[in-house]
């Protein structure tokens, strides 16, 4: 599985990218190697948001989580997927 990470109003540091890759990397065994997971991290005044979209043969698997901390949002998105 390939993971593409982008950000809106966010400086994507190595620590944040590594955390996303680590958490979503655990899901690789459930998807084909050519599957591309798209991750968008964004910040609003009151929340830090992660959106994960994974296309499948039958549609999409999608998770969106918003908390006051990116790392908590990443954990929740992993659990949702």
PLM regions and their residue ranges:
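N-terminal, polar/charged subdomain of small-to-medium soluble alpha/beta proteins
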Residues: 1-81
């Amino acid at each position: 599985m390939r993971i593409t990470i982008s950000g809106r109003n966010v400086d994507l540091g190595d620590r944040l990218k590594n955390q996303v890759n680590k958490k979503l990397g655990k899901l690789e065994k459930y998807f084909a190697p050519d599957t591309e997971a798209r991750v968008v991290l964004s910040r609003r005044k009151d929340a830090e948001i992660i959106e994960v979209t994974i296309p499948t043969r039958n549609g999409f698997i999608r998770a969106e989580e918003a908390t006051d901390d990116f790392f908590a949002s990443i954990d929740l998105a992993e659990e949702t997927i």
